[in-house]
């Protein structure tokens, strides 16, 4: 589990391509203070397992599913990436609960300067937007952010100068593809609210309101 507070910007040193998978080697600095083989590291928000460590770099395998669901389809050598180690049980929790399981990718369609902040607007597929709510949390390339507004097909977030300087969002522009992970709590709530709501021949589909009443929420 992660918090969405990026620890540093690393850099892709090499990419070894398999038939449908990747083995990527990444150079970092801060994260190596206690990193060991088997640890989890979020790379642009994608949870990967460290397989080798040496000389300021670590290697991790990327499965076909992770490639298909993320921007790793276009990953390049020397590309900067956001890095975060899995959180410790006794550590501070500065962002929100991030699983490192990317739901899909989005595309930046607007970048707007507003006083000391940059507002990014991201276009996302319906499978992601279904879980995007006003003032809710979302992870963009591993960064915990708050949704300031939404439409049916896009949402906007405001980025402070510190986040811009400490993450790869500082160099993001219109057209940049990003990894998106919605709030896991919202995903679970929607899943459980939909349980038993599927229609059958002798049981019509229940509305969300009737389910809330039936379960004592309203």
Regions found by a protein language model. Name each.
Residues 1-218:
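Conserved loop->alpha-helix
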């Amino acid at each position: 589990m992660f918090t969405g507070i990026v620890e540093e910007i690393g850099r892709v040193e090499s990419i070894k391509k398999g038939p449908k998978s990747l083995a990527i080697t990444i150079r970092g600095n801060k994260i190596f203070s206690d990193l060991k083989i088997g640890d989890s590291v979020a790379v642009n928000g994608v949870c990967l397992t460290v397989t080798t460590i040496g000389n300021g770099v670590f290697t991790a395998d990327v499965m076909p599913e992770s490639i298909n669901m993320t921007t790793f389809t276009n990953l390049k050598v020397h590309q900067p990436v956001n890095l975060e180690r899995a959180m410790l049980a006794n550590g501070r929790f500065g962002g929100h609960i991030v699983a490192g399981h990317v739901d899909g990718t989005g595309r930046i369609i607007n970048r707007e300067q507003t006083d000391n902040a940059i507002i990014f607007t991201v276009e996302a597929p319906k499978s992601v937007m279904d879980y995007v709510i006003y003032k809710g949390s979302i992870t963009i390339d591993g960064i915990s952010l708050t949704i300031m507004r939404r439409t049916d097909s896009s949402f906007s977030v405001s980025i402070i100068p510190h986040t811009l300087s400490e993450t790869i969002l500082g160099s993001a522009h219109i057209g940049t593809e990003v990894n998106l992970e919605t709030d896991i709590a919202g995903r679970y709530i929607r899943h459980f609210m939909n349980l038993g709501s599927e229609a059958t021949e002798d049981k019509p589909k229940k509305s969300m309101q009737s389910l809330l009443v039936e379960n004592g929420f309203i």
